[in-house]
């Protein structure tokens, strides 16, 4: 997606902070854009994995309703049978950077949990510094549809901070 690499690493930190036991991705191999009607996607040639009608914007590039690059793709095909010219001929999938960042966040939480067993107050202070606000911490935009308020993120996008 149009997001920084740390976003997937940060998900595990939010899970820890909010005591969320599970976090599921909606899809990991979304190569067929049946929702947007674009059909099979050559993920090695086209980053857009799904979208509705799109247009070109001079500063943003291709945009449109629900336009998303790489969303729903955590793995790439090692052997591509739909687009064989792009196939790498590898048995099994190729892990995406998104998957690797998510794994790194889960590993971070393992260390956070060990640190919390020794000093929970100091550990929580570190978590709160790294992820000041997330999800519903900003409030609710519409009480009839209690989704979180859309706002700027509260954590650093600098990978060196993480």
What is each PLM-predicted segment?
Residues 1-37:
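Catalytic-core regions of glycoside hydrolase
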Residues 20-21, 37-162:
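Catalytic domains of carbohydrate-active enzymes that cleave complex glycans
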């Amino acid at each position: 997606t149009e997001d920084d690499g740390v976003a997937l690493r940060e998900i595990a930190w939010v899970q820890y902070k909010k005591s969320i036991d599970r976090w599921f991705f909606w899809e990991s191999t979304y190569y067929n854009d049946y929702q947007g009607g674009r059909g099979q996607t050559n993920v090695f040639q086209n980053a857009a994995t799904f979208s509705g009608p799109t247009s070109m914007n001079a500063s943003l590039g291709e945009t449109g309703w629900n336009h998303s690059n790489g969303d729903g793709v955590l793995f790439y095909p090692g052997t591509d049978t739909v687009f064989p010219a792009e196939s790498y001929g590898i048995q099994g999938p190729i892990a995406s950077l998104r998957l690797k960042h998510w794994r790194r966040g889960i590993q971070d939480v393992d260390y956070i949990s060990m640190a919390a067993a020794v000093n929970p107050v100091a550990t929580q202070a570190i978590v709160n510094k790294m992820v000041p606000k997330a999800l519903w911490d900003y409030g609710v935009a519409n009480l009839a549809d209690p989704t979180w308020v859309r706002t700027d993120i509260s954590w650093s996008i600098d990978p060196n901070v993480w």
